[in-house]
Curated annotation (Swiss-Prot):
It is an enzyme of class 1 (oxidoreductase). It catalyses: a primary alcohol + NAD(+) = an aldehyde + NADH + H(+); a secondary alcohol + NAD(+) = a ketone + NADH + H(+); S-(hydroxymethyl)glutathione + NADP(+) = S-formylglutathione + NADPH + H(+); S-(hydroxymethyl)glutathione + NAD(+) = S-formylglutathione + NADH + H(+). It comes from Caenorhabditis elegans. This is Alcohol dehydrogenase class-3. Its main location: cytoplasm. One of its GO terms (cellular component) is cytosol.
């Protein structure tokens, strides 16, 4: 066991004291893990739009003060009573979608969701209903069961997977959310077939992972859609066959962008993916799916209280509207395989990293994210 096992650890963390305010670098206290919990020394964490979504006040489940972060990687520091699958020194990736392998969801091959700790996780607590984080005597909430914006975090043992110790932790931290989500939406949720046509709304990290998945699936046409044309080069690198800026399309009066797409692309696409979280582009994506068999997958998370709309005729005439969480991967068993795919050069990760920062620069990383200038910023807790 480590020298800190069983003790409270003082460490650095980026704390969100309230919504719509910069994160504050603080020294926090992290309590030892309880039964079926694992304390992890986080080495790397990435900044994701989901973190920004909560920090910006759009998350209906958003709780403050909180330690955000859900894409990360690190090394097990200590384990709680009853933990058999992990030991100090293991290289691990925290998982915001757990996998207990016991609940009715885990046993159902149709879903990758797990409900065992859903309520406590949504409430910002560990499974026993309490927090392991304090700062100056004040309790801090956990986030998505991960809280990777802390040098040490505590997670449930069903919210963690052990990965190949040869894999670079900086890189595989990204498999905790965005890349896995987009890639899996293609391969698992929609099962895109060879020769299919695909359109992707939003060319951030998730959208590019969708494109990567579509290329791997053998799609013959992959169209990237975004308002920021500087993203087109990356989209084509990952496999897009062409890119469109909707603002550059001259639409006849009364014609929608999706109607134009249907005209231009032989009745629409076999598969469409919305990776923005905008209810209007969700409708566009559905209505650009091919009549009779087109499938549209929602990946982006819309703001609290927003609703999607379309005419029922769009669905009656054979289109399917579906969504995905974490790309349909059953997390504990799948992420280690994705790491192996990366190590065997079947999966790109390095190319998603556009910025590297120290944790002290986390607010700059969020600024770059909001400006659309980054795919993934990776932050290190040790000086780089």
């Amino acid at each position: 066991m480590s020298s800190t096992a069983g003790q409270v650890i003082n460490c650095k963390a980026a704390v969100a004291w309230s919504a719509k305010a910069p994160l504050s670098i603080e020294t926090i206290q992290v309590a030892p893990p309880k039964a079926h919990e694992v304390r992890v020394k986080i080495l790397y964490t990435a900044v994701c739009h989901t973190d920004a979504y909560t920090l910006d006040g759009h998350d209906p489940e958003g709780l403050f003060p909180v330690v955000l972060g859900h894409e990360g990687s690190g090394i097990v520091e200590s384990v709680g009573e009853g933990v058999t699958g992990f030991a100090p020194g293991d290289h691990v990736v925290p998982l915001y979608v757990p996998q207990c392998k016991e609940c009715e969801y885990c046993k159902n091959p149709k879903t990758n969701l797990c409900q065992k700790i859903r309520i406590s996780q949504g409430n910002g607590f560990m499974p026993d209903g309490s927090s392991r984080f304090t700062c100056n005597g004040k309790q801090l909430f956990h986030f998505m069961g991960c809280s990777t914006f802390s040098e040490y975090t505590v997670v449930a043992d069903i919210s963690l997977c052990k990965v190949n110790p040869e894999a670079p932790l900086e890189k595989v931290s990204l498999l905790g959310c965005g890349i896995s989500t987009g890639y899996g939406a293609v391969l698992n949720t929609c099962k895109v077939e060879e020769g299919s046509t695909v359109a992707v709304w939003g060319l951030g990290a998730v959208g590019l992972a969708v494109i990567m998945g579509a290329k791997a699936a053998g799609a013959k046409k992959i169209v990237g859609i975004d308002l920021i044309e500087s993203k087109f080069e990356s989209a084509k690198f990952f496999g897009a066959t062409e890119c469109i800026n909707p603002k550059s399309v001259e639409l006849p009066e009364g014609k929608s962008f999706q109607a134009w797409l249907v005209e231009q692309f032989d009745g629409g696409f076999d598969y469409t993916f919305e990776c923005i979280g905008n209810v209007h582009t969700m409708r566009q994506a559905l209505e650009a799916a091919h009549k009779g068999w087109g499938v549209s997958c929602i990946i982006g998370v819309a703001g609290a209280g927003q609703e999607i709309a379309t005419r029922p005729f769009q669905l009656v005439t054979g289109r399917t509207w579906k969504g995905t969480a974490f790309g349909g991967w059953k997390s504990v068993e799948s992420v280690p395989r994705l790491v192996d795919d990366y190590m065997n050069k079947k999966l790109l990760i390095d190319e998603f990293i556009t910025h590297r920062w120290n944790i002290d620069d986390i607010n700059t990383a969020f600024d770059v994210l909001h400006k659309g200038e980054s795919l993934r910023s990776v932050l290190a807790f040790e000086k780089i």
